[in-house]
């Protein structure tokens, strides 16, 4: 199905082939994942469906052991990979947001390309709807993220630092088979959490304040991304009020998600609740984003997105209020859009 949609797009744009070099996009189509560093790793998909993977010679055996069953062209560091494939293309579709001007010139020289088109949106649209296999992997990543929060909460005590909690979570979760986090784990105490993308440091935990955890893990290349703001003791009334508003905004936004609903309308639901409570200026970001091979991917859950939710999408819902000197609260869940509504894949208590 993936390959068919690429070849259909090639025909639609009257192009000869697609040239894909983003490692995660290559993995999406081939099942082979590699970080080539400065070396070229590229997937060529021709209009007849044939696939050619260019890779360093040192990776050829790994490629052949992967699910990829197309042609493999390995090259030495002393060779120009493009010289090893003799073909001419009139029009080539590329990832326009990723292709460098230098690489474009090399493609023109090697393949005689006369014009370029964009394949980015087609790939984004494909990756936006997850297969059953992808969903199962994301679910497992979410279960492990829940476990991370559990580990972190159990480690809280007066005097512990943000950095110590981060280190404890990332060490202990390895016992569950986790080798990589989706992004740098965030643990922020009290008013330090009023910086939405703050950096954990030596701030010590005090009694009666909130603790914000924002984290995710990678399971078989798929990401989770969740946030919980938990009580340590009894936070003051103002901080609790902020928490209650954020929780209401998140719950009502999630309740509205189902196929056919306009994405911006869900952002509006959360934003209106926060604004009506008097905190609109303290909610400075979109409501959420797509989730899959990357922790942030297509589509944005924002007030400008007029697309509709579709079954198979996985998105985050993460309203927040950040009042300097008072508190920062964000609550985030990973949501699967189902045929009749939605399912929350993250489940740690709120």
Swiss-Prot record:
- Stored InterPro entries: Creatin/AminoP/Spt16_N, Creatinase/aminopeptidase-like, Creatinase_N, Pept_M24, Peptidase_M24B, Peptidase_M24B_aminopep-P_CS
As to how many cofactors bind and how, the note says:
Binds 2 manganese ions per subunit.
Which sites bind Mn(2+) 2? 214, 225, 332
Q: Does the keyword Kinase apply?
A: no
Q: What EC numbers are recorded for this enzyme?
A: 3.4.-.-
UniProt-annotated binding residues for Mn(2+) 1? 225, 289, 318, 332
- Lineage, top-rank taxon, reads Bacteria
Q: Which cofactor does it need?
A: Mn(2+)
Can you provide one Gene Ontology molecular function annotated for this UniProt record? hydrolase activity
Q: Which family does it belong to?
A: Belongs to the peptidase M24B family.
Q: What is this protein called?
A: Uncharacterized peptidase SSP1059
Q: Which organism is it from?
A: Staphylococcus saprophyticus subsp. saprophyticus (strain ATCC 15305 / DSM 20229 / NCIMB 8711 / NCTC 7292 / S-41)
Task: List the top taxonomic levels of the source.
Answer: Bacteria, Bacillati, Bacillota, Bacilli, Bacillales
């Amino acid at each position: 199905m993936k390959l068919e949609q690429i070849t259909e797009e090639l025909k639609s744009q009257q192009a000869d082939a697609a040239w894909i070099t983003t490692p995660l996009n290559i993995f999406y189509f081939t099942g082979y994942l590699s970080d080539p560093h400065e070396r070229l790793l590229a997937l060529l998909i021709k209009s007849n469906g044939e696939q050619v993977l260019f890779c360093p010679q040192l990776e050829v055996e790994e490629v052949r052991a992967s699910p990829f069953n197309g042609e493999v062209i390995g090259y030495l560091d002393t060779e120009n990979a493009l010289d090893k494939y003799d073909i001419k293309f009139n029009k080539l579709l590329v990832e326009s947001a990723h292709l460098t001007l230098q690489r474009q010139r090399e493609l023109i020289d090697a393949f005689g390309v006369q014009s370029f088109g964009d394949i980015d949106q087609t790939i984004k649209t494909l990756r936006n709807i997850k297969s059953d296999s992808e969903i199962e992997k994301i679910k497992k990543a979410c279960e492990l993220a829940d476990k991370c929060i559990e580990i972190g909460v159990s480690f809280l005590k007066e005097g512990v630092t943000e950095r110590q909690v981060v280190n404890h979570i990332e060490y202990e979760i390895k016992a569950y088979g986790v080798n990589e986090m989706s992004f740098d784990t965030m643990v922020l105490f009290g008013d330090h959490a009023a910086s939405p993308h703050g950096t954990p440091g030596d701030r010590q935990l005090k009694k009666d304040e909130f603790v914000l955890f924002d984290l995710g893990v990678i399971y078989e290349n798929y990401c989770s991304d969740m946030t919980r703001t938990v009580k340590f003791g009894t936070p003051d009334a103002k901080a609790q009020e902020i928490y209650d508003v954020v929780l209401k905004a998140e719950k009502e936004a999630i309740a509205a998600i189902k196929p056919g609903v306009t994405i911006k309308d869900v952002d509006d639901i959360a934003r209106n609740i926060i604004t009506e409570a008097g905190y609109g200026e303290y909610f400075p970001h979109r409501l959420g984003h797509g989730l899959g091979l990357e922790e942030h991917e297509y589509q944005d859950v924002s007030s400008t997105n007029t697309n509709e939710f579709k079954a198979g999408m996985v998105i985050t819902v993460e309203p927040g209020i950040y009042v300097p000197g008072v508190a920062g609260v964000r609550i985030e869940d990973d949501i699967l859009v189902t045929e009749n509504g939605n399912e929350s894949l993250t489940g740690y208590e709120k």
